[in-house]
């Protein structure tokens, strides 16, 4: 895995575009992630290809930013979006996440690597010259992580990108995959692993350590969170 963001920006380009600018008349790829603020579970990045015609279908389905939709509705919408739109998913499980984070020690670079891989994978399925992602960190992070196909694309990074239906659809697919994987981890441990990073999450972490030992924590949780010190009583 080449997670290093070492290449300079060359022929491809990035654009910082106001959130109010509409790109709905264009074929485009939306990219979004889920799980970066959740102690338990994976980091998931989704990329979704949308045309103006597909956008109309998504609007009829009332697709919008996953943060504004209940988990139940997300799990209902995701299969329909998967059937309707070409897409790709990159899921980094907790154990692999911890290995990568230990090497690069920078969440934004890890996010950029995931965004780039999801975009590159989708470009194997579709022809598209425009992608939209939420703004995080240095704009060049995603661009530097792209390989040959991705270098040909115009990447728009902006705040509140989820207002674009392509990004909203990606946010739903990413969140649905996160929820399903978190549920599977909970079943494996016979312990409910809550979302987020709350006192309930800390309690669940302590239960995992008590039942299975400290090493098991690294297979279900993102260890660089300050929650880990609280779970292990190191604060």
Locate the predicted segments by residue:
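RNase H-like, Mg2+-dependent phosphodiesterase core
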Residues: 1-235
């Amino acid at each position: 895995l080449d997670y290093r963001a070492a290449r300079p920006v060359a022929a491809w380009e990035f654009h910082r575009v106001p959130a109010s600018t509409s790109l709905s008349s264009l074929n485009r790829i939306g990219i979004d992630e889920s799980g970066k603020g959740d102690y338990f579970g994976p980091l998931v990045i989704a990329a979704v290809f949308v045309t103006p015609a597909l956008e109309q279908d998504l609007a009829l389905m009332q697709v919008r930013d996953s943060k504004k939709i209940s988990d139940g509705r997300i799990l209902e919408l995701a299969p329909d979006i998967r059937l309707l739109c070409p897409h790709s998913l990159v899921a980094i499980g907790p154990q692999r996440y911890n290995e990568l984070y230990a090497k690069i020690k920078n969440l934004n670079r890890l996010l950029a690597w995931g965004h780039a891989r999801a975009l590159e994978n989708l470009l194997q399925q579709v022809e598209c010259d425009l992608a939209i992602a939420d703004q995080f960190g240095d704009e060049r992070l995603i661009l530097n992580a792209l390989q040959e196909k991705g270098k040909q694309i115009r990447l728009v990074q902006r705040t509140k990108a989820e207002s674009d239906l392509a990004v909203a659809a990606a946010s739903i697919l990413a969140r649905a995959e996160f929820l399903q994987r978190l549920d599977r981890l909970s079943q494996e441990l016979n312990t409910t692993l809550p979302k987020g990073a709350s006192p309930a999450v800390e309690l669940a972490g302590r239960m995992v350590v008590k039942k299975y030992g400290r090493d098991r924590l690294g297979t279900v949780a993102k260890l660089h969170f300050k929650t880990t010190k609280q779970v292990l009583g190191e604060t």
